[in-house]
C-alpha cells in the first residue's frame, strides 16, 4: 500500500475553517501559497513529489492548478528524474497530472537525457508519461523528434510514434571548420516508429527507414517549394545504441546522390552519429557517373562528402580497369585518388601501368582521367605488328585516361 502525503487536502481544510467567506462560497477555487504533494513507496522511501510556489484548489472538482510545477521521481530514495513545466493540473491526490508549456523531463546521470514537449500527462501510479505535442528526446549529441511519445519509466522505454526523425544534434557539434565551405547539414533518418531505452541507450526501428542530407550552401527554395536533398539513404531498419554513438542500418542499404551521379549498394552499414560517418566492412558495389566501383570496405564522411575504400578497391569503365589497395573520391568535385599497389589496365595496346599513387577527375563526359604528378610509373604496352594500326605520322602518346 502506497502512502500519500495529504498536505494538499489538509491545507484546504485549514483554509475553510479560518475564513467564513470561503465557507459561503465553497464552489470557488482557493489560492494557496504553495503546493507540496508527495508519495512514498511500500518501504517508506520517497517515490515521487510535486511542488509549486503557487496553486489554486477546487474542492468540489478535486483539482489543483499549479504554476511553475516541479516534480521529482525517486529511485532507491535518490532523485532519478526531474520534471518541469509552466503550468500543471493535479487530479485528486495525484492520480494524474497534466503539464503544459515547455515541459522538460530530465533523466539524471553522467550523461543526462532530456525529453521535451508542449504538453504531457504524468500518471504516477502507472509510472507513465505521455507527451502528445511535439515531443523531442535528446542526449548530448543526438536527437529524436516525433508526433507522440510515451515514456514507461520502470521499463526504461520511450516509444516514439508518428514519423520519428533521428539526427545528429547540431548544437552539440564542434564549431571547427572552414567557414568559406560550409559542411552539409547533418543526416536525418526518418523511421515509421522508434523504440528507445534512454538509460541504456538501445534504439530499434525494425521497419524501412529513409535518410536525407541537404547542402548548406544551396540557395533557399521558393516559399511553397520543399528543399531537395543532396543525398538519400534507405535501409530495412536500424538498431544501435545512442549512448555509444552508433546505429547499424539493416541490409540492404542504398546511398544515392540526388543528382543521379553516384550510388552505393551495401550490406549492413554503421552510422557513427557523433562523427557523421557511414561505414561497412563488407563488400559493396557502386557507380560514379560512368565509373563502376566495388570494394571490400568503405567509409563515407558525410561532412566532407568523401568516399573512402580502405581495402580491395576496383574501378572500371569501358576499356579500362584500375585496382588498388585504397581509393578516395569526393562526390561534389569528382576528384579521385588511388594509392598502394595501383594497377591500371587498358584494352588499347594491352597497356598496364603500375604506380604507388594515381590521381584523377571525372570529366564532362562522365569518364575519369587519371594522372600521376610527381610520381614514378611503370607502363607496359603490346604494340601491333608492323603494318597494322596505320602508318606515316608518329602519334603523340595517349594520356593515362580512365
How would you label these PLM feature ranges?
Residues 1-402:
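Mature-chain termini and adjacent capping regions
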Amino acid at each position: 500500500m502506497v502512502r500519500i502525503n495529504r498536505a494538499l487536502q489538509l491545507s484546504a481544510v485549514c483554509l475553510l475553517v479560518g475564513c467564513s467567506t470561503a465557507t459561503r462560497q465553497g464552489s470557488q477555487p482557493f489560492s494557496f501559497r504553495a503546493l507540496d504533494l508527495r508519495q512514498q513507496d511500500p518501504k517508506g522511501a520517497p517515490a515521487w513529489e510535486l511542488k509549486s510556489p503557487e496553486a489554486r484548489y477546487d474542492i468540489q472538482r478535486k483539482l489543483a492548478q499549479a504554476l511553475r510545477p516541479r516534480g521529482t521521481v525517486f529511485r532507491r530514495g535518490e532523485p532519478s528524474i526531474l520534471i518541469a513545466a509552466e503550468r500543471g493540473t493535479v487530479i485528486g491526490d495525484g492520480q494524474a497530472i497534466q503539464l503544459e508549456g515547455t515541459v522538460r523531463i530530465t533523466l539524471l546521470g553522467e550523461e543526462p537525457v532530456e525529453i521535451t514537449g508542449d504538453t504531457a500527462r504524468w500518471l504516477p501510479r502507472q509510472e507513465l508519461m505521455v507527451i502528445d505535442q511535439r515531443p523531442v528526446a535528446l542526449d548530448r549529441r543526438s536527437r529524436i523528434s516525433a508526433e507522440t511519445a510515451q515514456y514507461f519509466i520502470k521499463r526504461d522505454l520511450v516509444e516514439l510514434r508518428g514519423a520519428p526523425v533521428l539526427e545528429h544534434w547540431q548544437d552539440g557539434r564542434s564549431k571547427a571548420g572552414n567557414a568559406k565551405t560550409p559542411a552539409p547539414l547533418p543526416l536525418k533518418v526518418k523511421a515509421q516508429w522508434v523504440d528507445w531505452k534512454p538509460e541504456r541507450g538501445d534504439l530499434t526501428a525494425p521497419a524501412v527507414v529513409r535518410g536525407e542530407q541537404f547542402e548548406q550552401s544551396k540557395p533557399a527554395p521558393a516559399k511553397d517549394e520543399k528543399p531537395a536533398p543532396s543525398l538519400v539513404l534507405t535501409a530495412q531498419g536500424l538498431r544501435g545504441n545512442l549512448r555509444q554513438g552508433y546505429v547499424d542500418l539493416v541490409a540492404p542499404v542504398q546511398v544515392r546522390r540526388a543528382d543521379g551521379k553516384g550510388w552505393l549498394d551495401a550490406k549492413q552499414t554503421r552510422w557513427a552519429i557523433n562523427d557523421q560517418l557511414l561505414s561497412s566492412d563488407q563488400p559493396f558495389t557502386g557507380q560514379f557517373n560512368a565509373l563502376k566501383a566495388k570494394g571490400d570496405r568503405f567509409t563515407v564522411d558525410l561532412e566532407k562528402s568523401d568516399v573512402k575504400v580502405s581495402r580491395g578497391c576496383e574501378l572500371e569503365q569501358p576499356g579500362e580497369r584500375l585496382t588498388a589497395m585504397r581509393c578516395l573520391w569526393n562526390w561534389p568535385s569528382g576528384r579521385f585518388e588511388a594509392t598502394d599497389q595501383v594497377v591500371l589496365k587498358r584494352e588499347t595496346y594491352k597497356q598496364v601501368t603500375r604506380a604507388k599513387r594515381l590521381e584523377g577527375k571525372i570529366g564532362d563526359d562522365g569518364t575519369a582521367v587519371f594522372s600521376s604528378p610527381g610520381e614514378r610509373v611503370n607502363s607496359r604496352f603490346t604494340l601491333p605488328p608492323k603494318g597494322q594500326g596505320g602508318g606515316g605520322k608518329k602519334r603523340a602518346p595517349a594520356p593515362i585516361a580512365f
